[in-house]
């Protein structure tokens, strides 16, 4: 009888140990699942903060990155063949005071001469546009935190206005000699001289004398800023133009503030 009792007690202990081990194993599995789930939740929360408020440093890098992308794209477009000539928004035509020259030439069957003048003006601007990128990049590097904040949270053309303020005089200084050389290279001075000469021969007309170099330089600069403004609008308004996570974060923040 005593032996039977000992046997039953031993069997009970073994069974209890088995149950306890099984329960512990099951508990560990549940704990593991909870821990994993909690970890993934934390990770998700952590990643969501990446789309929150950017730091001052991130805003600076983001704006500069966006503008460098836009400036590079814009200057490459305008400096290519037909960059000015093939773009109605920036195409350079006869100076306002000389448009009567163009009309007269076309009316007397000399339209090809007028076309040559327009072609040469735009080729000169395309040559000059190659000089613009370093000037714009330098202006981007000089931006202060105040400039960056004003651009990020400012009007749709805030960056374009910044460039106008900072780079116009440098662009004119750089463009004018390039355009003068280019006008001579493409024969613009000759075409213009021929066109103005033919017009000035017409009785009773007021002779025209336009400084082509200054005119084309100013129109080329105007065209640069038109293109820059278009690139700025793309970055601000098109999610596809925000090509990096940093740009998405910075401009996403700007969207929320407006």
Map each language-model feature to its residues.
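Bacterial N-terminal signal peptides
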Residues: 9-17
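Bacterial N-terminal signal peptides that target proteins for export
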Residues: 1-8
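Mid-length scaffold segments of soluble, non-membrane domains
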Residues: 110-182
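N-terminal Sec/ER secretory leader and immediately downstream segment
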Residues: 26-118
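A cross-kingdom marker for long, charged
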Residues: 26-39, 213, 220-258
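Sec/Tat signal peptide C-region and signal peptidase I cleavage site
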Residues: 19-23
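An amphipathic alpha-helical core segment
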Residues: 178-223
């Amino acid at each position: 009888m005593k032996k039977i009792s000992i046997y039953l007690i031993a069997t009970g202990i073994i069974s209890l140990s088995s149950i306890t081990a099984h329960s512990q194993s099951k508990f560990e599995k549940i704990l593991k699942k909870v821990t994993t789930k909690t970890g993934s939740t934390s990770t998700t929360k952590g990643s969501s903060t990446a789309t929150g408020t950017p730091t001052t440093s991130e805003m600076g890098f983001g704006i500069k990155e966006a503008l460098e992308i836009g400036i590079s794209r814009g200057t490459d477009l305008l400096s290519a063949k037909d960059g000015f000539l093939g773009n109605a928004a920036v195409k350079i035509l006869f100076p306002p005071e000389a448009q009567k020259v163009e009309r007269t030439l076309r009316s007397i069957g000399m339209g090809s001469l007028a076309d040559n003048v327009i072609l040469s003006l735009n080729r000169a601007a395309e040559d000059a546009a190659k000089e613009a990128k370093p000037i714009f990049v330098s202006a981007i590097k000089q931006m202060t935190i105040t400039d960056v904040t004003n651009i990020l949270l400012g009007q749709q053309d805030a960056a374009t206005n910044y460039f106008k303020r900072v780079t116009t005089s440098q662009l004119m200084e750089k463009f004018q000699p390039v355009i003068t050389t280019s006008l001579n290279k493409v024969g613009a001075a000759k075409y213009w001289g021929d066109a103005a000469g033919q017009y000035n021969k017409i009785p009773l007309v007021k002779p025209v004398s336009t400084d082509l170099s200054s005119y084309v330089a100013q129109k080329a600069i105007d065209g640069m800023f038109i293109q820059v403004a278009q690139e700025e609008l793309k970055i601000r308004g098109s999610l596809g133009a925000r090509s990096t996570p940093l740009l998405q974060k910075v401009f996403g923040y700007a969207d929320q503030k407006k």
